[in-house]
């Protein structure tokens, strides 16, 4: 999640971890946004340190993917470590079409930490949005099939915990 700077921000995905008073993960919320300004959250129950959630795709993220398929979502975020890794895999009929990985370290959100992060990573609030549009232009020029944006669904849906099931797409 990138903080709003000078009133500007775009976060394709933000992940929230809800913990109990003992520090154990209880709920994961994956908040997904598209470039049309729509947002949808996939929420699921955590069952330990290796939780894999599966959610039916009901939110239009990219005009280059159909409204079909499943997401496999996994987060590795130990309450006693600052390392965080998020893996998201989009599959249609069991075939992986897109895999996205986010890695980083947790930091306290202060003015100094934001400035230090901006300088160290050369990130800026609209960089993800610009990168998405550049990639979309490349796909469009390659004549990749284009899917129109449907009406946005309800604001959230529940993801199923599939940690104990076999994972044919290798997310686990």
Q: Where does each model-flagged region fall?
A:
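Mature, function-bearing regions of proteins
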Residues: 1-172
